[in-house]
Amino acid sequence: MSIGLAVGLIVGLSILFFIIGGVVAFFVTRRLFQKQLKENPPINEKMIRAMFLQMGVKASESRIRQVMRSMQQAK
C-alpha cells in the first residue's frame, strides 16, 4: 500500500463522512423543528379571539391587532 493511496483513502473517507454527517444533522434538525411546531404552534388571530371569548370579552379588531403586535414585539 503506497502513501498516496493511504492519503487519498483518508481524504476520501473524511469527505464522505462529512457529507453523511451533514445529511443526518439536517434531518434530525428538521424533525426536532417540526416536533416543536407541533407542540407549540404559533399564535394567530383566531387563537386570540378564542382566548378573549373564553374570558367572556368581545374583542374588537383593533384590540386583536394590538395583541398580535405586542406578541410579535415580545419575540
From Swiss-Prot:
Subcellular location(s): the record lists: Membrane
List where the protein spans the membrane.
Answer: 8-28
Where is this chain primarily localised? membrane
Which keywords appear in this protein's UniProt record, sorted alphabetically?
Membrane, Transmembrane, Transmembrane helix
Gene Ontology CC terms, in alphabetical order: membrane
Task: Please indicate if the UniProt record lists Transmembrane helix as a keyword.
Answer: yes
**Membrane topology field:** Single-pass membrane protein
Q: What is an example of a Pfam family matching this protein? A: UPF0154
Checking InterPro entries in the record gives: UPF0154
Q: Which family does it belong to?
A: Belongs to the UPF0154 family.
**Name of this chain's protein:** UPF0154 protein MYPU_1460
